[in-house]
Amino acid sequence: MERNQRKTLVGRVVSDKMDKTITVVVETKRNHPVYGKRINYSKKYKAHDENNVAKEGDIVRIMETRPLSATKRFRLVEVVEEAVII
């Protein structure tokens, strides 16, 4: 499988407390199959962050990769937008 065919997701980092691992929440909107109302869905993914560059609150792009641990199946591609520290 080539790299350009792998899934890429954009989400927000909700945890960076682990070494070389971040937790990313990806939010999507779908229509309800019967009623047609737009419903928000969110799912958490653990992603590999080799250099510990992503911080909590950042918007990041992650890409599907081989299994890196029992729960990690994604890796960090880039930090799209850094969080504003107040």
Curated annotation (Swiss-Prot):
| Record's keyword annotation contains Endoplasmic reticulum | no
Any GO MF annotation of the entry: structural constituent of ribosome
> Per the record, GO CC terms?
cytosolic small ribosomal subunit
Keywords, comma-separated and alphabetical: Ribonucleoprotein, Ribosomal protein, RNA-binding, rRNA-binding
Q: Does the keyword Nucleotidyltransferase apply?
A: no
Q: Name one GO biological process term.
A: translation
- Top-rank taxon: Bacteria
Pfam families found in the cross-reference section: Ribosomal_S17
The protein's matches in PANTHER family, at most eight in alphabetical order, are given as: 40S RIBOSOMAL PROTEIN S11 FAMILY MEMBER (PTHR10744), SMALL RIBOSOMAL SUBUNIT PROTEIN US17M (PTHR10744:SF1)
Question: Briefly, what is this protein's role?
Answer: One of the primary rRNA binding proteins, it binds specifically to the 5'-end of 16S ribosomal RNA.
Q: Which family does it belong to?
A: Belongs to the universal ribosomal protein uS17 family.
HAMAP family (alphabetical): Ribosomal_uS17_B (MF_01345_B)
Its subunit composition reads:
Part of the 30S ribosomal subunit.
What's the protein here called?
Answer: Small ribosomal subunit protein uS17
Annotated organism of origin = Streptococcus thermophilus (strain ATCC BAA-491 / LMD-9)
Gene name, please? rpsQ
